[in-house]
């Protein structure tokens, strides 16, 4: 079975949101606003993804009360702390901008692919994608991702490895893939953990 992802979107500054065709929305803001040349306007919306349809209603209620300013402040603090840990590493590579830029891009990717525990995934781990057959944690990737996370997020690195050890077999092997529904866990290409 393929997991279905439900996207919950809430436009906080909108009065009305309508679908247009299969892939577009028309958003009518609560207040008319004449945008002057050279000026900008900010429209706030929240988007969250859930893997079970019944969770979508809970997510909608939760995102209605998000304190945006505090969320952005907390996120900036987390990002800056992680960035500082990585860029201040005692490495000759962190002295050259080309390598520093790559490190920042790697940090962005590691953060973007992180997923919290859900369903039969008991510890947070990274998904290469959240849709299709790759919507889960892959053992080969997990060990490498953990080795990157440990520089700025040691608890995330630990969680990445524990997600696979949750399914470790008696012979020491871990599944090649674990998913939201454990029926999809792939034992056919199992591997010894390289943690």
PLM region descriptions:
Residues 1-135:
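Acidic/polar, glycine-enriched structural segments that form the non-catalytic walls/loops
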Residues 84-195:
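Substrate-binding groove/exosite segments of carbohydrate-active enzymes
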């Amino acid at each position: 079975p393929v997991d279905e992802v439900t996207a919950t979107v809430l436009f906080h500054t909108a009065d009305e949101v309508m679908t247009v065709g299969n892939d577009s929305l028309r958003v009518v803001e609560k207040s008319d606003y004449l945008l002057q040349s050279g000026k900008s306007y900010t429209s706030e919306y929240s988007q969250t993804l859930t893997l079970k349809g019944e969770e979508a209603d809970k997510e909608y209620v939760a995102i209605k009360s998000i304190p945006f300013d505090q969320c952005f402040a907390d996120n900036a603090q987390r990002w800056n702390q992680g960035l500082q840990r990585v860029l201040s590493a005692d490495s000759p590579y962190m002295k050259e901008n080309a390598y520093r830029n790559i490190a920042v891009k790697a940090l962005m990717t590691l953060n973007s692919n992180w997923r919290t525990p859900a369903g039969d995934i008991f510890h947070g781990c990274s998904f290469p994608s959240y849709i299709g057959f790759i919507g889960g944690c892959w053992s080969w990737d997990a060990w490498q991702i953990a080795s990157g996370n440990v520089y700025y997020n040691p608890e995330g690195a630990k969680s990445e490895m524990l997600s696979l050890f949750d399914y470790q077999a008696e012979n020491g092997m871990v599944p090649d893939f674990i998913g939201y529904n454990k029926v999809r866990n792939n034992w056919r290409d199992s591997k010894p953990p390289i943690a």
